[in-house]
Amino acid sequence: MSINKQQILDAVSEMSVLEISELVSMMEKKFGVSSINNNNINVNKVDESVEEKSEFDVLLLEIGKNKISVIKSVRSALSLGLKESKDLIESELPITLKTGLNKKDAESLKKEIETSGARIELK
């Protein structure tokens, strides 16, 4: 007598969770396999294929309370004159301060200007 897949499925659907767990253990032993969740392996492969961003833009989102300190920080960080720094800071927000920086330089610039009270974002 041959049992088809539908009959097996019907028999399994009538079992309790404990019985199904025991059946899985028996199948693992019989066939020398493991029921490790393969989804975790696939997720890791997808994560590896996603490239990390290599170029960043530094945006000034908010000046904060100490405008003069922000002007000085921007002037120093971007090697601008006083008037250019002031005009840049007083233009409409958000302001792109620098584009195409690597992650290390972008983080450094962000930290330098944020110490003056400004709010910076990396894109």
Swiss-Prot record:
Superkingdom of origin organism: Bacteria
Record's GO cellular component terms: cytosolic large ribosomal subunit
GO terms for MF: mRNA binding; structural constituent of ribosome
One record GO biological process: translation
SUPFAM superfamilies hit by this protein: ClpS-like (SSF54736), Ribosomal protein L7/12, oligomerisation (N-terminal) domain (SSF48300)
Keyword vocabulary terms for this entry: Ribonucleoprotein, Ribosomal protein
InterPro entries, per the entry: Ribosomal_bL12 (IPR000206), Ribosomal_bL12_C (IPR013823), Ribosomal_bL12_C/ClpS-like (IPR014719), Ribosomal_bL12_oligo (IPR008932), Ribosomal_bL12_oligo_N_sf (IPR036235)
Protein role: Forms part of the ribosomal stalk which helps the ribosome interact with GTP-bound translation factors. Is thus essential for accurate translation.
Subunit structure, as described in the record: Homodimer. Part of the ribosomal stalk of the 50S ribosomal subunit. Forms a multimeric L10(L12)X complex, where L10 forms an elongated spine to which 2 to 4 L12 dimers bind in a sequential fashion. Binds GTP-bound translation factors.
Family assignment from sequence similarity: Belongs to the bacterial ribosomal protein bL12 family.
Name the record gives this protein: Large ribosomal subunit protein bL12
Organism: Wigglesworthia glossinidia brevipalpis
Lineage: Bacteria, Pseudomonadati, Pseudomonadota, Gammaproteobacteria, Enterobacterales
